Design a protein with these regions (language model features):
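Early transmembrane hairpin module of multi-pass membrane proteins
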Residues: 11-14, 22, 26-62
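Polytopic alpha-helical membrane-helix bundles and their juxtamembrane interface segments
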Residues: 1-21, 25, 69-73, 77-207
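Membrane-water interface of transmembrane alpha-helices
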Residues: 54-71, 194-195
């Protein structure tokens, strides 16, 4: 519970800094994601565990990328291009395929990588695992768009955060569920704030 509260605290700070377009989104986020990699492994939410490991790597990438384009720790915001959307589609498809495969093979993995007495099949998927597959893809795309400083990242965060509220409540992670409720609210505020900033500092459209 203590680790969960600490992870929630730094996760909250990270989303707040993201809302402000402040580069501190990444160091605070790294602390949170590392803690949640351990917690999600413990709760057998492998999809979200993998996405938090991905968050850690993307946070380092985003930190470097933002540092090159930041002025007084505040970054320049832009809209998603056609090429970006193709990349998003590829990332989403990869995530859906990979995480589905991980859950499909879960009985084999939990049996110390032995097929003895193991039955594989989609009928063994838990309802929360289907949701986990979907939200993992949403968050993966959202994280990449945030690293690229695209305003549309907030749309993915809003949808993913909202879905995650009942998911973690079902898993008994009360503080994490509450965190995602706050994340949903902050993500909506972040989208509004970034949109206002973008309107005041227009960027030429790209194809």
């Amino acid at each position: 519970v203590v680790l969960e509260i600490i992870g929630v605290f730094f996760g909250f700070l990270s989303v707040w800094f993201a809302k402000k377009g402040n580069i501190w989104v990444y160091p605070t986020g790294i602390i949170s994601t590392i803690l949640f990699v351990y917690l999600l492994w413990h709760y057998v939410l492998w999809g979200d565990m993998l996405i938090n490991a991905y968050y850690t790597a993307m946070s380092i990438y985003g930190w470097v990328l933002w540092a090159k384009n930041a002025h007084n720790n505040v970054i320049t915001i832009s809209r998603t291009t056609s090429r970006d959307w193709y990349i998003c589609a590829g990332l989403g498809l990869f995530s859906l395929t990979f995480v589905t495969t991980v859950y499909y093979l879960k009985p084999f993995i939990q049996n110390n990588f032995s097929m003895e007495g193991v039955a594989l099949g989609f009928e063994h998927f838990l309802p929360t695992e289907y949701v986990d597959v979907f939200t993992t893809a949403i968050f993966l795309v959202g994280m990449w768009l945030m690293a690229k400083r695209k305003i549309e990242n907030w749309i993915f965060w809003i949808v993913g955060d909202f879905i995650s509220v009942p998911l973690y409540l079902k898993k008994g992670m009360l503080f994490t569920s509450f965190q995602y409720l706050l994340f949903t609210i902050i993500a909506i505020m972040g989208y509004i704030e970034w949109k206002r900033h973008l309107r005041n500092t227009p960027v030429p459209s790209q194809k």
